[in-house]
């Protein structure tokens, strides 16, 4: 993935995000992606080459390295960045589905017909649930990778000395030394802190979406017409459009599209 593709992806996600979502994208791009590209490879580039052990036994150093680093930190963070940004694609795909559905509707019934959606990118109906589901996935992914990072390396610290005991082909307990442990520990703390900030922002965005949904529902219930006014207007407008098509000769009286007026009240946007 090049920078242009990444920029287009982030711009598309940012277009349909809330204020918390835009801050989340900024944190991910500045404090995680850029820091990962600029500093991570330099800090962790020498991890296996400079992993020294006090033994000359062939293969012992590689086995001890694999024992302590089952997966490289830098590769784990790369997977985390990929998986944590993937749920945002659900929102983009749902909006694209709405736009295509709207295009086919206008192509079939004409430009004067009632729109299926006032705004295809507005988080109402199914898109609201898709957006909420993407946030829940982000939270789960963040917690999962933090758990893996904490479990695989026995905490977020980076010891100067590790010992390999009873590991073939090492003959006995072998002491191994990690290169630049302090720098790697500080970098690990920084990445964990960035993940924690993203978790807080995602949780705040979930609370904001739910609170805004509840307030909007209460406001609708307090209105005199309730929920019954909007379907009636939609049905009347759709029927007028249907009759115009009949007068123009674009539809036959016994065509399948005659059911459009009857089904108008049940056309719930997805």
Swiss-Prot record:
<dbReference type="InterPro" id="IPR038359">
    <property type="entry name" value="Connexin_N_sf"/>
</dbReference>
<dbReference type="GO" id="GO:0043231">
    <property type="term" value="C:intracellular membrane-bounded organelle"/>
</dbReference>
<dbReference type="InterPro" id="IPR019570">
    <property type="entry name" value="Connexin_CCC"/>
</dbReference>
<feature type="topological domain" description="Extracellular">
    <location>
        <begin position="41"/>
        <end position="75"/>
    </location>
</feature>
<dbReference type="InterPro" id="IPR017990">
    <property type="entry name" value="Connexin_CS"/>
</dbReference>
<comment type="subunit">
    <text>A connexon is composed of a hexamer of connexins. Interacts with CNST.</text>
</comment>
<comment type="similarity">
    <text>Belongs to the connexin family. Beta-type (group I) subfamily.</text>
</comment>
<protein>
    <recommendedName>
        <fullName>Gap junction beta-3 protein</fullName>
    </recommendedName>
</protein>
<feature type="topological domain" description="Cytoplasmic">
    <location>
        <begin position="1"/>
        <end position="20"/>
    </location>
</feature>
<keyword id="KW-0303">Gap junction</keyword>
<dbReference type="InterPro" id="IPR002269">
    <property type="entry name" value="Connexin31"/>
</dbReference>
<dbReference type="InterPro" id="IPR013092">
    <property type="entry name" value="Connexin_N"/>
</dbReference>
<dbReference type="GO" id="GO:0005243">
    <property type="term" value="F:gap junction channel activity"/>
</dbReference>
<keyword id="KW-0965">Cell junction</keyword>
<keyword id="KW-0812">Transmembrane</keyword>
<feature type="topological domain" description="Cytoplasmic">
    <location>
        <begin position="211"/>
        <end position="270"/>
    </location>
</feature>
<keyword id="KW-1133">Transmembrane helix</keyword>
<dbReference type="GO" id="GO:0007267">
    <property type="term" value="P:cell-cell signaling"/>
</dbReference>
<keyword id="KW-1003">Cell membrane</keyword>
<feature type="transmembrane region" description="Helical">
    <location>
        <begin position="21"/>
        <end position="40"/>
    </location>
</feature>
<feature type="topological domain" description="Extracellular">
    <location>
        <begin position="150"/>
        <end position="187"/>
    </location>
</feature>
<feature type="transmembrane region" description="Helical">
    <location>
        <begin position="127"/>
        <end position="149"/>
    </location>
</feature>
<dbReference type="GO" id="GO:0001890">
    <property type="term" value="P:placenta development"/>
</dbReference>
<feature type="topological domain" description="Cytoplasmic">
    <location>
        <begin position="99"/>
        <end position="126"/>
    </location>
</feature>
<keyword id="KW-0472">Membrane</keyword>
<dbReference type="GO" id="GO:0005922">
    <property type="term" value="C:connexin complex"/>
</dbReference>
<dbReference type="GO" id="GO:0005737">
    <property type="term" value="C:cytoplasm"/>
</dbReference>
<dbReference type="InterPro" id="IPR000500">
    <property type="entry name" value="Connexin"/>
</dbReference>
<feature type="transmembrane region" description="Helical">
    <location>
        <begin position="188"/>
        <end position="210"/>
    </location>
</feature>
<dbReference type="Pfam" id="PF00029">
    <property type="entry name" value="Connexin"/>
</dbReference>
<feature type="transmembrane region" description="Helical">
    <location>
        <begin position="76"/>
        <end position="98"/>
    </location>
</feature>
<comment type="function">
    <text>One gap junction consists of a cluster of closely packed pairs of transmembrane channels, the connexons, through which materials of low MW diffuse from one cell to a neighboring cell.</text>
</comment>
């Amino acid at each position: 993935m090049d920078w242009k593709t990444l920029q287009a992806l982030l711009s598309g996600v940012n277009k349909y995000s809330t204020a918390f979502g835009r801050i989340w994208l900024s944190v991910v791009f500045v404090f995680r992606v850029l820091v990962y590209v600029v500093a991570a490879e330099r800090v962790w580039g020498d991890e296996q080459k400079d992993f020294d052990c006090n033994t000359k036994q062939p293969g012992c150093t590689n086995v001890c390295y694999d024992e302590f680093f089952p997966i490289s930190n830098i590769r784990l963070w790369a997977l985390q960045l990929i998986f944590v940004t993937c749920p945002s694609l659900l929102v983009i795909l749902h909006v694209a589905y709405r736009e295509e559905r709207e295009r086919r509707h206008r192509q079939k019934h004409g430009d004067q017909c009632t729109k299926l959606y006032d705004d295809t990118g507005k988080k109402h109906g199914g898109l609201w649930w898709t957006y909420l589901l993407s946030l829940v996935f982000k939270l789960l992914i963040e917690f999962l990778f933090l758990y893996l990072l904490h479990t695989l390396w026995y905490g977020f610290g980076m010891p100067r000395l590790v010992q390999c005991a009873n590991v073939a082909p090492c003959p006995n307990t072998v002491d191994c030394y990690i290169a630049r442990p302090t720098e790697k520990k500080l970098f690990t703390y920084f990445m964990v802190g960035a993940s924690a900030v993203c978790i807080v922002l995602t949780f705040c965005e979930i609370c904001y979406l739910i609170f805004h949904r509840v307030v909007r529902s209460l406001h609708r219930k307090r209105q005199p017409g309730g929920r019954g006014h909007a379907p009636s207007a939609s049905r009347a407008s759709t029927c007028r459009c249907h009759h115009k098509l009949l007068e123009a000769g674009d539809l036959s009286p016994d065509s399948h599209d005659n059911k459009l007026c009857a089904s108008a009240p049940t056309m719930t946007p997805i």
